[in-house]
UniProtKB/Swiss-Prot annotation:
One of its GO terms (biological process) is L-leucine biosynthetic process. This is 3-isopropylmalate dehydratase small subunit. It comes from Bacillus thuringiensis subsp. konkukian (strain 97-27). Pathway: Amino-acid biosynthesis; L-leucine biosynthesis; L-leucine from 3-methyl-2-oxobutanoate: step 2/4. The gene is leuD. Catalyzes the isomerization between 2-isopropylmalate and 3-isopropylmalate, via the formation of 2-isopropylmaleate. The lineage of its organism: Bacteria, Bacillati, Bacillota, Bacilli, Bacillales.
């Protein structure tokens, strides 16, 4: 996993509450286990019309929001079933940071495990953040837990364990591999039955 320290990018805004994983990526696209190729199905039923043409009224389709790597959204983002395909679709689309009023627990952990930073931020702060010009680069500094725009500085908090994993680009496997020698030594000492 790529370390996450400071990210600069533009933001897309989708301030709906209770966006569930089936709205993030509908179930018909979950037939693969590769982590890539899901971005084109992100928010599929909202992004496209019945002819698979982009819906011009959907916020992510706005020309000035294309290429955004920060998503600002409502409360309880990622609720519903605990499919890991939802964070895969967000990451494959290009999002590195998701700022919401809250997240479903499993979705929150799956974001972290896939190198995305989910940030919990109250509504008043998010409303200030969404007023940022669509072309402005927003800086997200994980190490100092600060989001900076040209007019505001917002502080956020993150659990130390998750922060360290993201800062160092570590997932469960890479953490386990840090103890490879100890594991081999243990296996050598323990009798086989």
């Amino acid at each position: 996993m790529e370390p996450f320290r400071i990210h600069k990018g533009t933001a897309a805004v989708l301030m709906n509450d209770n966006i569930d994983t089936d709205q993030i990526i509908p179930k018909q696209y979950l037939k693969r286990i590769e982590r890539t190729g899901f971005g084109k199905f992100l928010f599929d039923e909202w992004r496209y019309d019945n002819n698979r043409q982009e819906n011009p009224n959907f916020p992510l389709n706005a020309p000035d929001r294309k290429g955004a790597s920060i998503l600002i959204t409502g409360d309880n983002f990622g609720c519903g079933s605990s499919r890991e395909h939802a964070p895969w679709a967000l990451a494959d689309y290009g999002f590195r940071v998701i700022i919401a009023g809250g997240f479903a627990d499993i979705f929150y952990m799956n974001c972290m495990k896939n190198g995305m930073l989910p940030i919990v931020m109250d509504k008043e702060m998010r409303e200030k953040l969404v007023k940022t010009d669509a072309r402005e680069q927003i800086e997200v500094d994980l190490e100092n837990e600060v989001i900076t725009t040209s007019t505001h500085r917002f502080h956020f908090t993150i659990e130390k364990m998750w922060k360290e994993k993201l800062l160092n680009g570590l997932d469960e496997i890479s953490i386990t591999m840090q103890y490879e020698q100890e594991i081999k030594e243990y296996e050598r000492r323990v009798a086989v039955y």
